[in-house]
A protein has these predicted regions:
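Residues forming the flavin
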Residues: 1-117, 121-196, 200-516
Length: 516
């Protein structure tokens, strides 16, 4: 095992010139990661001609979007359908312990978004030339995250620390003039025909619904209690499970396309097995912590299987937001010291071949699989599960082995081959055996599979143009994971910043035309 360090040092001009000129020294100038605002409100906002921006959703994307808007002086109004993070935590644990589901306050909905109940991973593969990810991490540290997230290669926070951080970021938004309303659901957009100021052309929406060439102008939102809020600049950061909101947007003419996502199971091994396979004799060393992994396999049937949201020393959690459905996810605390390692093992699917027909067909497939999992689990929110050895042998499981399940409310052993389409079962079986050649013990018969994992990413993309506004609805800014533009806490936060910048420039003009 080799440890790789990067050291950031400040040198005098002569020494810096000398070191940078040596071929034998691996040295380069450190990038300037300081964040620079693209614009700022010069006076109290709004004035008579302007309206405060609205941010729908208060997960990682919505939080960073609202925070940046507030820091630029735009006093955003945040509308979150779920509860504040403390109440939401009580509701979520109540579901895990007593199977009492609150469909508006759970793992998916509420302050902090789905990322609150996760491993809290803070790394991303998105291109980030402007170092917006550093802005996200800086804000997290300011809100109480461990400073080490600024320099570790694979930083993470964990659920308990995220709760306090989210509350502190909320407090800053409010202190800067923003408003945050919980248990507040948007049920309708207000809109008017869009008039192109350059051509004075009036567009109207045809009976066919959303069309990327026909634009409307959003003018506000209607809430579930009938309240009307006016705004011509609305960020939609509602997360990947806001299925009723997706349907509402489509019916109101917002241009949406289906997109690929993945389906599969959670796999659990004793963390000690993964540590030994990855670290050998160094397993358990305090500097290494709990081992993780990242795996991918391209199957004979043309499918790709990969590990997703791997949680070292974590737990498998119940993550449904709809009654009569079972969905799994993974979660870790900062310490990552639970007995099991878990990860989703999922198969990629696409709208052309696996759920054709209409824009929201991917949601229909998700619901079908989640409802089936609920039934296979005994219709009490227990999850269907099977030992890996039995799964590979195509035999139902009847008793647990060394790997004890962490999923609450509980599991029901049986046959998972009924839980997913045949092509997915075939691909996962093949992949597990291949992964065992990379990580010794991955296919151990005693390991446990729990189903189903269906919410790896949003099944739709709310299309937007270079100005970050929806192609058919001016003033509507689709953002984050739910809109199809992010996957994880860090990338969602980055997208929230980008959208906030575009919105602010649209309202106020830019101080730097190169940054948006």
């Amino acid at each position: 095992i080799q440890l790789i360090y990067q050291v950031n040092v400040q040198l005098g001009a002569e020494l810096e010139k000398d070191l940078l000129g040596r071929e034998s020294v691996i040295c380069r100038p450190a990038p300037d990661t300081r964040y620079r605002f693209v614009t700022m409100a010069e006076s109290v906002f709004p004035n008579e001609a302007q309206q405060r921006p609205i941010v729908v959703g208060f997960g990682p994307c919505g939080i960073l979007s609202a925070l940046l808007l507030a820091q630029m002086g735009l006093r955003p109004i945040v509308l979150e359908r779920g509860s504040n993070v403390r109440q939401r935590t009580k509701d979520t644990w109540g579901f895990w312990r007593k199977s009492q589901l609150n469909t508006e306050s759970n793992v998916q909905f509420g302050e902090g978004g789905a990322g609150t109940f996760s491993d809290g991973k803070l790394y991303s593969q998105v291109k980030d030339k402007r170092h917006l990810g550093r802005k996200v991490l800086d804000e997290f540290v300011k809100a109480g995250a461990p400073p080490e997230i600024l320099f570790l290669s694979k930083p993470h926070i964990g659920t308990f620390k995220l709760v306090t951080m989210v509350e502190r970021m909320r407090a800053e938004i409010i202190s800067l003039g923003g408003e945050i309303h919980f248990d507040t659901k948007v049920v309708r957009l207000l809109q008017e025909p869009f008039v192109d100021s350059k051509s004075n052309h009036l567009d109207t929406l045809t009976s066919e619904g959303a069309n990327e060439n026909i634009q409307r102008q959003v003018t506000g939102v209607c809430l579930a209690d009938g309240t009307i809020l006016n705004s011509r600049h609305i960020v939609m950061a509602m997360g990947h499970s806001a299925r009723d909101t997706f349907s509402m947007l489509l019916k109101q003419g917002v241009y949406i396309e289906p997109k690929p996502f993945s389906i599969g199971f959670r796999i659990e091994h004793p963390q000690s097995v993964i540590d030994s396979a990855r670290f050998g004799k160094n397993a358990g060393h305090v500097m290494l912590g709990a081992a993780d992994y990242k795996l991918v396999h391209h199957c004979a049937n043309g499918r790709s299987v990969y590990s997703f949201c791997m949680c070292p020393g974590g737990t498998v959690v119940a993550a449904t937001s709809e009654e009569g459905h079972v969905v799994t996810n993974g979660m870790s605390q900062y310490s990552r010291n639970e007995r099991n390692a878990n990860s989703a093992i999922v198969v990629g699917i696409n709208p052309e071949t696996d759920y054709p027909g209409h824009v929201l067909a991917g949601i229909d497939l998700q619901r079908k699989l989640e409802k089936l999992a609920y039934e296979l689990g005994g219709s009490d929110y227990s999850a269907p599960a099977q030992l890996v050895g039995d799964f590979l042998a195509d035999e139902p499981s009847t008793a647990l082995a060394s790997a004890q399940p962490s999923y609450k409310p509980g599991i029901k052993l049986g046959d998972l081959s009924e839980a997913l389409p045949e092509f997915a079962i075939e691909a996962i079986r093949e992949a597990i055996l291949v992964f065992d050649r990379k990580i010794k013990g991955f296919a151990m018969p005693e390991a446990l599979l729990t189903g189903v994992e269906t919410r790896t990413s949003s099944p739709i993309c709310i299309k937007r143009g270079p100005d970050f506004q929806n192609l058919s609805m001016k003033g509507l800014y689709p953002a984050g994971e739910g809109a199809g533009y992010a996957g994880g806490i860090l990338s969602a936060g980055i997208d929230g910043i980008k959208v906030a910048e575009a919105l602010a420039v649209s309202l106020l003009g830019s101080t730097d035309s190169d940054v948006v």
